[in-house]
């Protein structure tokens, strides 16, 4: 070893010794970091549409998002659900019309289900079905208003979609939603091979898809051939890293405290938030079908998505993780003309074509 190399090596050892001295005992008084205020420019690697959208939008106001939930005991969930439903219904009706998707409602095993049929089916999907689970924090998205993304999937993948209008709180907390999905899936298996079924959704719907597969496994059911998890709410505890790092940055969710935190408790009722049927990230992912995953760098559920992906890969499951620069929670579902949206659903179609039998 030369004199110069010995000098560099000695400095490296000294630096490592310093780091060792700093952790972990020197942080015993405070395990939290305080981050200074910072400016975030529109991300250069995002699409022009997304950059423009971010540039023309004010930074999310965390304080305003928390305000309605300061007195959570007196909060009127039913009024908020009714207000959201009216808006969601109008959006769904416009989207279904614009995408030329035919919608019919039916009851399956006592569960309300919407069937969405595209104008033209992909010949490869003639006898295939996508079992869709809507998002909405396990509280919103009931009825017609929950089929918007189902219509997008039907149109872009040219596949028949069954959207499960599962029961939700306040009247029907956990495990009602999981029970409804299992009931519909069992009925579907009577006429459709498991290899011809895909399941999935966005946000709470993605989390519910993962929880449902845990339940399918527990009941020894044949598993679907493919899973779509768009930014899954897979951990309802406030422990995921991006819940903190992307608070006030995610333009959709904004903050966990307030709506998300209250919805988590409302949904779980008295059950443990770490129950894998509530927070599927805590479950066993061995034997899972292939999973197509979407998130963004400004998504508060980025960590949930990453954690599920890591567990899938440790279990040896094929998992296709796609992270879009600058995208907030489920941003791909809001602007269908954006490259982020077109790539998300275009690649989903290819994923379904690859795995549906």
Model region roles, listed by residue range:
Residues 1, 5-10, 18:
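N-terminal export leaders
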Residues 11, 16, 24-94:
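N-terminal targeting or regulatory segments adjacent to alpha/beta-hydrolase or S9 domains
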Residues 29, 53-75, 95-357:
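Alpha/beta-hydrolase superfamily serine-hydrolase fold, recognizing
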């Amino acid at each position: 070893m030369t004199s110069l190399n010995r000098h560099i090596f000695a400095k490296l050892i000294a630096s490592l010794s310093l780091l060792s001295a700093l952790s972990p005992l020197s942080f015993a008084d405070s395990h939290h970091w305080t981050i200074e205020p910072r400016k975030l420019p529109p991300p250069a690697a995002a699409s022009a549409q997304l950059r423009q959208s971010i540039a023309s939008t004010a930074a999310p106001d965390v304080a305003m998002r928390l305000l309605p939930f300061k007195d959570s005991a007196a909060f009127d969930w039913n009024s908020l659900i009714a207000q959201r439903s009216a808006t969601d219904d109008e959006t769904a009706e416009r989207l279904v019309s614009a995408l030329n998707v035919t919608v019919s409602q039916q009851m399956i095993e006592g569960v309300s289900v919407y069937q969405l049929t595209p104008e033209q089916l992909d010949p490869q999907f003639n006898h295939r079905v996508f079992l869709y689970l809507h998002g909405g924090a396990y509280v919103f998205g009931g009825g017609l208003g929950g089929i918007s993304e189902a219509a997008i999937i039907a149109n872009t993948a040219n596949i028949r979609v069954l959207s499960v209008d599962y029961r939700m709180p306040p009247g029907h907390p956990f495990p009602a939603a999981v029970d409804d999905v299992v009931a519909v899936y069992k009925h579907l298996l009577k006429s459709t091979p498991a290899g011809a079924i895909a399941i999935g959704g966005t946000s709470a719907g993605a989390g519910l898809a993962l929880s449902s597969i845990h339940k399918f496994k527990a009941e020894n059911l044949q598993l679907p051939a493919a899973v779509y998890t768009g930014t899954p709410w897979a951990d309802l505890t406030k422990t995921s890293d991006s819940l903190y790092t992307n608070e006030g940055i995610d333009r959709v969710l904004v903050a966990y405290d307030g709506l998300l935190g209250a919805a988590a408790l409302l949904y779980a009722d008295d059950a443990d938030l770490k129950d894998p049927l509530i927070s599927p990230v805590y479950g066993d992912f061995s034997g899972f079908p292939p999973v197509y995953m979407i998130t963004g760098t400004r998504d508060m559920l980025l960590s949930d998505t990453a954690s599920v992906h890591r567990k899938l890969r440790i279990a040896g499951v094929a998992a296709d993780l796609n992270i879009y620069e600058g995208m907030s929670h489920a941003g791909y579902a809001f602007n269908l003309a954006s490259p982020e949206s077109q790539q998300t659903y275009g690649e989903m179609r290819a994923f379904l074509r690859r795995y549906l039998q």
